[in-house]
Amino acid sequence: MKELLQKYENKSPEIIFNWKDPETEAEGWTVINSLRGGAAGGGTRMRVGLDINEVLSLAKTMEVKFTVSGPAIGGAKSGINFDPKDPRKKGVLERWYKAVSPLLKSYYGTGGDLNVDEIHEVIPITEESGVWHPQEGVFEGHFKPTPADKINRIGQLRHGVIKVIENPQYSPSVARKYTVADMITGFGVAEAAKHFYNVHGDSIVGKRAIVQGFGNVGAAAAFYLSQMGAKVVGIIDIVGGLIKEDGFSFEEITELYLAKAGNTLVSDHLIPFSEINEKIWSLKTEIFAPCAASRLITQDQIDHMIGTGLEVISCGANVPFADKEIFFGSIMEHTDNKVSLIPDFISNCGMARVFAYFMERKVQMTDEAIFNDTSETIRKAIQRVYDKNQTKTGISATAFEIALTQLV
């Protein structure tokens, strides 16, 4: 696995596209790690201090993710070094997408990512540059559909991603019009933990869980974990957190979901961050779902949780550990050897899978069909790992080996 990983990490990407905005200090990159299967996919992010190395490592990560979610294409990523709060943001994105539009018409598919919104920015702005849909390049390069079929599948994709959830089983409140895109990643994080317990002949019911981060992913993960019978005992967010050792009820978790302001936890009983960050890691818990920013979790925090009975980690965040390596750093390796660490590219592949589902062929557009497809994709990936490794450790190492064998 280590040799495969080194080979994969050190291989130069096929395409690097570099852009400097003529009107501001913005600079952007698209890195296409490979045109596996004729195309590549990966979102567009924006933040101050972003550099080409960040974009490259994310492109490599996307390629690994596609081995689970499909389609069987290469990984890519776009990044713009610019302040997303700057009022000139829209102009920067307009000029960026104009420059990158030939790639988007031919072999590169993109979407929203950190500080770039799929629905309000990516779709309308790429459309102005003559791109039918941000994923058009994946249709062109990989699926090669007939013109009529392409129109049909682009329609499916457009409606599917912004589809409002009508089935109360999948939504904290149907009246609030939450979309598939809002909920699917957190759903996958919860399902991954559930399937892992099932494949090992155990059940998630009654297991205690700590969720880190209460944005789209963390809040949805807490909602679905609670719904399936796990007991959420702690939530830690950037502003603070909450602890309830005998577990919050499903109603309480649903209320917290509905009360969150944007990506932030809101509660009258909020424990300040400095205090919760001391306490939460030594709570008794079986499940940990890191769903905040990347590279936050220290070995010390993990060891505390292992000491109080941690069993399974299901990653909502990409690379949640504070390692410098792209993939398999020392904290991750240490954790993988001690507990069942389900890697990000399995547990958080929900959104990528939804894209693949709508692109592959004409499909059912019901909530149940969409969510079941993601659940089944994650279940199969966990089953493949189990077929190679029936123990409860080395899960991530086994998963990487399965993925990299397809790529190297």
Q: Can you say where each PLM-predicted feature lies in the sequence?
A:
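Glycine-rich phosphate/diphosphate-binding loop of Rossmann-like nucleotide-binding domains
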Residues: E166-K284
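Rossmann-like adenosine-cofactor binding region
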Residues: G240-L341
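Glycine/serine-rich phosphate-binding loop and adjoining beta1-alpha1 elements at the start
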Residues: V68-A72, K77-I204
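Adenosine-phosphate binding glycine-rich loop
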Residues: I306-V408
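Short, Gly/Pro- and small/polar-rich lid/capping loops
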Residues: M1-K20
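Conserved active-site and cofactor/substrate-binding residues in soluble primary-metabolism enzymes
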Residues: L50-E54, P87-G91, R95, D117, ...
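N-terminal glycine-rich anion-binding loops that anchor highly charged ligand groups
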Residues: E23-R36, T67-A72
